[in-house]
Amino acid sequence: SEKITVFQKGNFQVTEXSSHFV
């Protein structure tokens, strides 16, 4: 899966499996 960076609630959430960066 490609890493999708989503700007949500002032935090950067990267959807990769179940990995997320805050």
Swiss-Prot record:
Function: Catalyzes the hydrolysis of ester bond in chlorophyll to yield chlorophyllide and phytol.
Protein name: Chlorophyllase type 1
Keywords: Chlorophyll catabolism, Hydrolase
EC number: 3.1.1.14
Ranges in a coiled coil: none
Keyword Protein transport belongs to the record: no
Source superkingdom: Eukaryota
Family that this chain belongs to: Belongs to the AB hydrolase superfamily. Lipase family.
GO biological process, one term: chlorophyll catabolic process
Pathway(s): Porphyrin-containing compound metabolism; chlorophyll degradation
Any one Gene Ontology molecular-function term assigned to this protein's record: chlorophyllase activity
Catalytic activity: a chlorophyll + H2O = a chlorophyllide + phytol + H(+)
Influence of pH: Optimum pH is 6.6-8.6 for chlorophyll a hydrolysis, and 6.6-7.6 for chlorophyll b hydrolysis.
